[in-house]
Amino acid sequence: MTMRRLMTWLFGAFLLLLREDAFALGLLDGYHLALENDPQFQAAIQEHEAGRQYRALGRAALLPRLVYSYNRGRSWSDVTQTTTRGDFKEDRDYDSYVSTLSLQQPLFDYEAFSRYRKGVAQALLSDERFRSQSQELLVRVLEAYTGALLAQDQIELARAQKRSYREQFQLNQRQFERGNGTRTDTLETQARFNLAQAQEIEARDSQDAALRELERLVGAPLEIADLAPLGERFQVRPLSPASYTAWRDLALAENPELASLRHAVDVARYEVEQNRADFLPRLGLYASTGKSKSGSENTYNQRYETDSVGIQLSVPLFSGGETLAATRQATHRMEKSHYDLDDKVRETLNQVRKMYNQSSSSAAKIRAYEMTVDSARTLVMATRKSIAAGVRVNLDLLNAEQALYSAMNELSKAKYDYLTAWARLRFYAGVLDEADLELVAANFVSGETPARRRDCATTDCPAPLHTLSKTDTEENRSALN
């Protein structure tokens, strides 16, 4: 078992032991675990390390090549020499060897030079791609974390609705038995209860998916009770810089995806030059030294020590059209890389604009939802009084309560949407880092579990429920039967 797997197992066991003590996995804790345990990020690390070797591979074509070769063998031959005196035969049985040390250095090799520049561009592309994947990990952790908490808020809201509708249903039944209500009131309340139950089930499915995604990132089993909830004192930070133009310019200059595609254009351009180099001559310097004994029949029983130095020139004349076709193919690929870059620039700027609008409007949106919640809560209380006075009917109360819970759900969603939009804005601008995640993490309450801390439409709020048990389902059915 590797040390990394051992630490992951120990952390999972630690969570299981402390789960009942309301242990909270903070947002930063989750990110630090993801750095070590997320398979996608670990694969990105290895890809980056492999990509860094492109520079050395390209440079190797410009450096000298030193080769040593040695050959030793034994030969047997029958030699017949024809002279004026007749034929003479000789049997030869001898050892031979050839030892050579050679050095080659390119002097003019445009293909090697293009390959070197392409290798540098490929290494830079790998750096930028890894920078993008590093920032993306921050976003993935945040979105999985907030997705699970948002689903928990929706579960608790659905439970609050069910409790309210259950009480209203019981009231409708009593009034119907006394002759003060109608069967329609009971059916309306039952329909709203069933809808809230369906919403709770849907929220639980969403929460389970978010938790499984977070587990995949951190490499340890998690439950919603392990996460630190959103605090009461939620603040919307003013954007810095404040203008969209500044964020646009920042994205064009710093976005790692755009930077990697610019390097991809360079790689494609040097690929064209590398293929075009096959039209050009090559000039190289060579030097060698060698020793041999009986290296051939002509040097039988002779020893040689040979040193040589010179230049070698090769000029391509005709390759059957291969060079021209390869150059054209590389040119089309280069043009494609330009269009890929243009498309990514437009997509990135659209996302920057979208995240900028969401971030800059979040403060007003959250304030509006807070006012909506207050107004809806007041409407619920007023509607109850109106029903008691005989002015309103049961459906009016159900609609008022539905509006209240809908506003509370939108308020919760707006807060989480702001956090992810703010982080994604910095991600698309290419400046997202761990310090930004620390600012986001300050909105969560460490050491607590995600229990509901919001006002309810009733004075007695239902306690948080972490699992939907069979008993709960049976109780829900019995309340409506």
From Swiss-Prot:
Basic and acidic residues bias spans: 469-481
Disordered: annotated segments: 462-481
Key word Transmembrane present: yes
GO molecular-function term, one example from the UniProt record: efflux transmembrane transporter activity
Gene3D superfamilies: Outer membrane efflux proteins (OEP)
SUPFAM superfamilies (alphabetical): Outer membrane efflux proteins (OEP)
NCBIfam families: type_I_sec_TolC (TIGR01844)
Domain of life: Bacteria
Subcellular location as annotated: Cell outer membrane
InterPro entries: Bacterial_OMF, OMP_efflux, T1SS_OMP_TolC
Function description: Involved in the secretion of alkaline protease.
Protein name: Alkaline protease secretion protein AprF
One example of a Gene Ontology biological process annotation: secretion
Originating gene: aprF
Similarity section: Belongs to the outer membrane factor (OMF) (TC 1.B.17) family.
Entry GO CC: cell outer membrane; efflux pump complex
One Pfam family matching this protein: OEP
Organism in which the protein naturally occurs: Pseudomonas aeruginosa (strain ATCC 15692 / DSM 22644 / CIP 104116 / JCM 14847 / LMG 12228 / 1C / PRS 101 / PAO1)
Keywords: Cell outer membrane, Membrane, Transmembrane, Transmembrane beta strand, Transport
